[in-house]
Amino acid sequence: MGDEGLRALPSVDRLLNEAATPALVAAYGRPATLGALRESLEWARARIRAGGAAPDAAALVARASQSLEERLASTLHSVINATGVIIHTNLGRAPLSQAARAAVEDVARGYSTLEYDLDAGQRGQRSLHAEQLLCQLTGAEAALAVNNNAGAMLLALTGMAQGRGAVISRGQLVEIGGGFRVPDVMAQSGARLVEVGTTNRTHVRDYETALADGADIALILRAHHSNFRIVGFTTEPSLAELVVLGTRHGLPVVDDLGSGALLDTAQFGLMHEPTVRESLAAGAALVCFSGDKLLGGPQAGIIVGRAAVVEPLK
């Protein structure tokens, strides 16, 4: 009975000539349709060997159609965020506002001035659109947007400290979501990691010692603690103190703000987060932060700061 059922199965060519198959080829392409039909035949053979009945050609094509539909269906679905985490990076990060969605739809439905200067009648700069707004929002001289904040830090370290030292407190060598670790990003950039202080206590004098050793140091890096806090017997220099130290040694300070608040979050009853303007006002030469968390935009890493520092990164 098993062998008879196997012999009764239609060939792939016959399945291709079934009435419903041309629509599958038109929708999914011939290679994908062929693959799905062959998978249907494999399923049928296994079913027959297990004692089941042999399906007819129409049933095999219907199974292939269902397989193609499921395989190519979107895996993104709307969900309700009941986690208690307001901005959940695994659930799409910050939802886009209605105004932002409308602006995207308005531009994305056709051609745009993404990289064209209408007044000059020639190619323009695609980064200019975001840069102008970011400079207005933060007070920075120049700005640049990349894929994510890890990418922003990687670009900054590569452009400013490749082959040279970058000084950072041991308490800031954190790992953020997605497995991004500050030491790994620094290693990939080609910068040499110079750790100072301890996990819970780092002083200005620790930075001073590292800078006085005669090592080739390019910058001082301050990294956001991400989503954890060390409490108790702790201390670390303020950004202003690091800027004073950097100025004395002729070194820029790069401040990785993580989520990157543009507004004072305390006014909404939340813990105060350092704002981008505060970092720049304190004297940071360059500030990196995310565009898809507190800023409320799509996934992005944003770099703002002095023009002399940002421009070479472009």
Predicted regions and their residues:
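Glycine-rich phosphate/diphosphate-binding loops and the adjacent beta-loop-alpha structural elements
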Residues: 42-45, 85, 264, 294
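Long amphipathic N-terminal alpha/beta scaffold segment
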Residues: 51-96, 102-103
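Glycine-rich phosphate-binding segment of PLP-dependent enzymes
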Residues: 37-38, 42-43, 82-83, 93-119
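Short gly/ser-rich anion-binding loops that grip negatively charged ligand groups
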Residues: 50, 54, 86, 90-94, ...
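Long amphipathic alpha-helical segments
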Residues: 1-69
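Conserved PLP-enzyme active-site core in the AAT-like
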Residues: 121-314
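Short Gly/Ser/Thr- and Asp/Glu-enriched loop/turn motifs at secondary-structure junctions
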Residues: 9-10, 80-84, 295-298
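Solvent-exposed alpha-helical segments within well-ordered globular domains of core cellular machineries
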Residues: 13-17, 35, 42, 62, ...
